[in-house]
Amino acid sequence: MIVTVTPNTCVDYTLLLPEFRLGETLRATEAAWGMGGKAADAAWILGRWGVPSLAMGFAAGQIGQRMEAMLQARGVATDFVEAEGETRLNVVVVCAKSKQQSTLTANTLRVRAEHVDQLRSRYMRALDQASCVILGGSLPEGAPHSLYSDLIGAARARNIPVIFDSSGSALRMGLAARPQLIKPNQAELAELTGQVVKSLEDAYQAASVLQRTFGVDLIATMGEQGALALIGQKHYYIPPLRVEAVSTAGAGDAILAGMAVALSRREPPEAGLRLGFALAGAVLRTLATADYQPEDARRFLEQVQLLPWPS
């Protein structure tokens, strides 16, 4: 079974506005609830695709209850540790006129040492049935900076593949524990390597440094430029799909979901890349974070290109 861990859980409430102006009452033309938190997003996406998973992490309050109910409605098993405060509620604002989006968030979830101990204990039990682990997102207030590296190390000690997606110090510390796969974006590549990353060639050079240094596979996402995948000795460029994006929230997490399916089933990485980017394309077409129509994903499966890189 695929196991996902989201320490700083959240739910996204997305508003579509004709245009955005400060200082005025703005009326949305559409609103949608979606999942939030990278690993939980992946679990929600997997559930809609019919792939079972176990979602873990910390949760609290009414928003935490809503999040668990949303996951369970997709057939996802849940085992969240009840923490303090409230699971985050993110407000995502999508502006139809400018094609830009912004996210309003606040750190409302708090954990104590006993909560962390509970999560570690439950996680170790979950590893008994895990075929792949997805870890992702930020860390809540009170969580130790070493949490991700500890969880990664425990899974790797059992030869369970780990997909890891975070940012900042959490990403750097987790990377040192050598997960199997990470998915840095353009800014994260630059931060991790200290290199300027503007072009695909820049991204390839930075990703190659990380692959050599940490022995990790990478999918480097470069927005409208597409993505690069460095999976062992196989290096690919994935051109962007032709999609009229409604919202980008959750699309990257769909890539994690696709790769987890391939790793869990011991399929070739190419199968995971095709599924992941097809799911991502479908997510782009939907306002709610990490939501999609399976028929869109099936259609995009035939359109995903894996081009050898360097060409």
Predicted regions, residues:
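Glycine-rich phosphate/adenosyl-contacting loop at the front of the ribokinase-like
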Residues: 1-56, 64-66, 239, 310-311
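Conserved phosphate/ATP/ADP-binding segment of small-molecule kinases
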Residues: 145-234
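Short beta-strand scaffold segments in enzyme catalytic cores
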Residues: 44, 91-93, 226-230
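Conserved phosphate-binding/catalytic region of the ribokinase-like
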Residues: 172, 200-311
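Conserved N-terminal subdomain of the carbohydrate kinase-like
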Residues: 24, 48-130, 299-311
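Gly/Ala-rich phosphate-binding loop of Rossmann-like dinucleotide-binding domains
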Residues: 47, 156, 264
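Hydrophobic anchor at the start of a short beta-strand
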Residues: 2, 51-53, 78, 162, ...
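Short beta-strands and strand-loop turn motifs
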Residues: 103-105, 130-138, 165, 183-191
